[in-house]
Design a protein with these regions (language model features):
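Residue-level detector of conserved, well-ordered beta-strand and adjacent loop positions
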Residues: 16, 35, 87, 143, ...
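Active-site-proximal helices and loops of the catalytic beta/alpha 8
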Residues: 28, 41, 182
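Short proline/glycine-enriched turn/loop motifs at strand-loop junctions of beta-rich domains
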Residues: 16-22, 49
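Short beta-strand elements bearing conserved aromatic residues within extracellular beta-rich modules
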Residues: 23-25, 54
Length: 231
């Protein structure tokens, strides 16, 4: 559910927020009302363009929320508490010939982007790919890179599944790393966490039944089979 783009004759921006009575979208500082449709959906003809930042305001029947990031954000340039940004999906890939590596042939190196290089970024990892290739490594596994609170973190309390940590270089930095790794015959494997959200920066419960009453040491449990999970 969450957010979806709809293209009919004109593009529209839709968000699923059954917990809200009303909703607005803020695009580069300007508020626009969203129209309620069926099943907890709200829609708006104002659509942010790539590079524009946006956030949502939700009315719970009593008061308006503070600006909230997109629950399905692709990029959080100011961190998990800030506005979301529309990401352009085009990229000048050079790895068209890449065909992957059989599991039985993999020589795997697990690394943490934030500490693997002095820069603590995807570009910093690129600078050490030749070193890894010389070791005989042909696959790297990245500890989780989904957005988390702060600048450095193990990654296991991320809150935005579809985005990439801004301090590591964001989605463009990850694309550059994957492309550079493939050019050296190195596969890239992502370590991901899908059973919980981190304790800071998770606003999804304000939109709808995305979490349950359960809790882990890392944060709220994702609502996979509880009330509202089949909405």
């Amino acid at each position: 559910r969450l957010v979806r783009w709809v293209f009919v004759t004109t593009p529209r921006f839709n968000i699923w927020a059954p917990a809200a009575h009303s909703a607005r979208i803020i695009i580069d500082g300007t508020e626009h009302d969203m129209r309620a449709t069926n099943g907890g959906w709200f829609t708006c003809d104002e659509v942010p363009s790539p590079g524009q930042r946006y956030a949502f305001l939700l009315f719970d029947g009593t008061s308006w929320s503070t600006p909230l990031p997109d629950p399905r954000t692709r990029y959080q340039p100011e961190g998990v508490h800030g506005p979301s940004e529309v990401v352009a999906t085009d990229f000048a890939w050079t790895d068209e010939a890449w065909g992957g590596i059989e599991l039985k042939d993999q020589v795997l190196y697990e690394l943490h982007v934030g500490t693997f290089s002095p820069e603590g970024t995807f570009d910093g990892v690129i600078g050490k790919l030749d070193y890894l290739a010389d070791l005989g490594v042909n696959a790297i596994e990245l500890l989780p890179v989904q957005p988390f609170a702060g600048e450095r973190n193990w990654g296991y309390d991320g809150v935005d599944w579809f985005a990439v940590q801004h301090s590591y270089g964001g989605p463009e930095g990850l694309k550059r790393l994957v492309d550079a790794a493939h050019a050296r015959g190195i596969a890239v494997i992502m370590d991901v966490v899908y059973n919980h959200f981190g304790p800071e920066g998770n606003y999804k419960g304000l939109f709808g039944p995305y979490t349950t009453a359960g809790h882990t040491a890392w944060g709220d449990v994702v609502n996979i089979s509880g009330p509202g999970s089949d909405e």
